[in-house]
Design a protein with these regions (language model features):
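Aromatic- and charge-enriched surface segment that lines or borders ligand/interaction sites
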Residues: 87-137, 171, 261-264, 311
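Alpha-helical secondary-structure segments
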Residues: 43, 114-123, 167-173, 177, ...
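N-terminal lobe/hinge region of extracytoplasmic solute-binding protein
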Residues: 22-24, 28, 43-92, 123, ...
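Ligand-site clamp/hinge motif
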Residues: 124, 209-212, 237-283, 410-412
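Gly/Pro-rich hinge or "lid" segments in bacterial periplasmic/extracellular proteins
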Residues: 74-75, 178-245, 249, 259, ...
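Surface-exposed binding/hinge segments that line
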Residues: 119, 134-198
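Detector for C-terminal structural segments
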Residues: 24-26, 227, 324-353, 388, ...
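A structural "hinge/loop" feature
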Residues: 45-64, 84, 111, 133-134, ...
């Protein structure tokens, strides 16, 4: 599946450079020998656009040019950079955050941005009827606002812990101390209250969100046109608060198949190609045309999620599935060099990796023995579902199916679009399903394994594990590491899901695209830096570099109130 990556200007980088001739060492930013210049269009390949963007976290990849956030996440060091909030303070007891909003900002329709828009956007994220909570994997943590549950349940029209002081000041208060909560708030995109309050929460998903009159934000680009099955186009926001972006237009061109998008990239019809397959990494690595390869995403695991069907209740069945998968063979055969085997929450080498947690090396005999002990019915056929669509995904699905068949678990592969898979999960119709994530580790775990998690289709509910997740959301440093170590010991014993590899993300950009960046981490949704990308047709020296931790990212306007 294609993903679209964010772009930004950064002037701090390492002296040594790398390029696509050695793709596995590729840097994460393209740097040209040109001065920034205005004008032009970039075309980015994607394979889907969700009409109602708040329904899925996947949507953020093509809406970041449109909307603003209170602050954005520095993708290199996870520091927070002011955006629609110029600054903020968190109380000593970590229960109250006061946000001071940027003055003079206007939405695309010319309406001034105020604190009421922040309040309404928080409500959208939390109100189940609006189907907006799926958009933010960390939405579960917003429930820690005072009075949040009463609002969610319809008992109150407002959230007690959200207080608008004036047009440019808003105070958020949590029920319990939680310093990390105020980081999560930055992930909420800010929408204009005045456009949507005329509709009920239930009506919002039914609006034409591809209309320039509905998709309105404060970002550097404005919605221009949507042609179903073909493309989505954005144009520069001439009145963007931080200054007009360099590009005139961004086009997200839709391809039903990844391979078709690759062909378009090779023909020069698109400028950005994302989520390269292993074969493409090898082929483009020769770099015959000077294309720039960008590498990122150090933590991006894939899992086989297990639902709460009666035949999966015995943990020995779940453990058998983990023993059944030959992770290293799967990687070496299909995608050498761009995946690492993984059988716990973090890959080996990650600072949070616990080497003492229960391990699951490839052992089909042990898998068969566990299934026999658990009374597994060898005639039982279970669905193995996914929303991934690429040939690479089909290949590794076939391998997983083969491994499970060898130990006595019969499966049937089901491919479906993400919205359909989500509906199946909500209806209790999923059995085994493959997915992945790469952003907020704590928020993801709450969404997948918390008792009220949006995607906890397995209904996993371990009170100790949930308590640890809650503690993790309020911790940092060595304390957080200890918590994650303990979480891995529980997770690897019970296996509410089966990790099998950690993927590395590779993208390609044409050499004329300057300041294109693949972040090293996806921990924050909010980075939005398309305004600093520019086109230089006559660049003689385009390189891929590894930036140092920058002192400030994005438009220079981010650095001052």
């Amino acid at each position: 599946m294609f993903k679209i990556f964010s772009l930004f200007l950064c002037t701090f980088f390492l002296g040594s450079t790398v390029n696509a001739s050695n793709p596995l060492e590729a840097g994460s930013m393209s740097v040209c020998d040109c001065q920034p210049r205005d004008g032009g269009t970039i075309t980015i390949a994607t394979d889907w656009v969700l009409p109602y963007p708040w329904k899925s976290s996947e949507a953020h990849t093509y809406i970041t040019p449109i909307y603003g956030n209170l602050y954005i996440g520095d993708p290199y060091n996870n520091e927070l950079i002011p955006d629609l909030a110029t600054h903020w303070e968190v109380s000593k007891d970590k229960t109250k955050g006061t946000f001071h909003l940027r003055k003079g900002v206007k939405f695309h329709d010319g309406t001034p941005f105020t604190a009421k828009d922040v309040e309404w956007s928080l409500k959208l994220t939390m109100k189940p009827e609006a189907e907006g909570s799926d958009f933010l994997m960390g939405a579960a943590r917003l429930k820690e606002l005072k009075g949040a549950q009463n609002f969610i349940d319809g008992k109150t029209k407002d959230i007690k812990g959200v207080n608008v002081i004036d047009d440019h000041t808003i105070v958020l208060e949590t029920a319990v101390p939680n310093g990390q909560f105020f980081d999560v708030v930055g992930k909420v995109y800010i929408l204009p209250e005045h456009i949507y309050t005329k509709y009920s929460w239930e009506e919002l998903p039914k609006l034409d969100w591809m209309s320039p009159k509905v998709r309105v934000g404060t970002g550097p680009f404005k919605m221009e046109e949507f042609v179903e099955g073909q493309y989505v186009s954005y144009v520069a926001n001439e009145n963007y608060w931080a200054g007009r972006p360099h590009l005139d237009r961004i086009i997200f061109r839709l391809f039903a198949e990844h391979e078709t998008g690759t062909l378009a990239f090779e023909k020069g019809e698109v400028d950005v190609l994302s989520f390269l397959t292993a074969e493409e990494v090898k082929r483009f690595g020769a770099n015959p045309e000077g294309n720039i390869m960008l590498r990122g995403t150090p933590l991006s695991p894939n899992y086989i999620n297990v639902t709460d069907m009666p035949y999966f209740q015995d943990k020995r069945v779940r453990q058998a599935i983990s023993y059944a998968i030959n992770r290293q063979q799967l990687i070496d055969t299909l995608i050498p060099g761009i995946r690492d085997p993984m059988d716990t929450l973090f890959p080996e080498g990650h600072p949070m990796y616990n080497p003492n947690a229960k391990r699951y090396p490839y052992d089909p005999e042990k898998a068969r023995a566990l299934l026999k002990e658990a009374g597994w019915d060898p005639n039982q056929v279970v669905d193995l579902s996914t929303y991934y669509t690429s040939q690479e995904a089909l290949d590794w699905l076939a391998f997983v199916q083969m491994y499970l068949t060898r130990v006595g678990i019969k499966t049937k592969v089901r491919q479906m679009p993400w919205p359909d898979l989500e509906k199946a999960g909500q209806a209790g119709e999923l059995e085994l399903w493959l997915t992945g994530y790469s952003r907020d580790v704590i928020g993801d775990h709450m969404a997948y394994f918390g008792p009220e998690g949006t995607w906890n289709y397995g209904k996993y509910n371990n009170s100790k594990y949930h308590d640890l997740m809650t503690k993790a959301s309020r911790s940092g440093g060595e304390e957080l590491k200890k918590i994650f170590f303990e979480m891995q010991e529980i997770f690897n014993e019970e296996l509410p899901a089966i990790p099998f590899w950690n993927r590395t993300k590779f993208n390609m950009v044409k050499p004329k695209i300057c300041n294109a960046v693949e972040p090293w981490t996806d921990q924050h949704f909010g980075y939005r830096n398309f305004e600093n990308t520019f086109i230089c047709e006559d660049s003689k020296n385009v390189i891929s570099v590894r930036p140092k931790t920058p002192t400030g990212l994005g438009h220079p306007g981010y650095l001052s109130p």
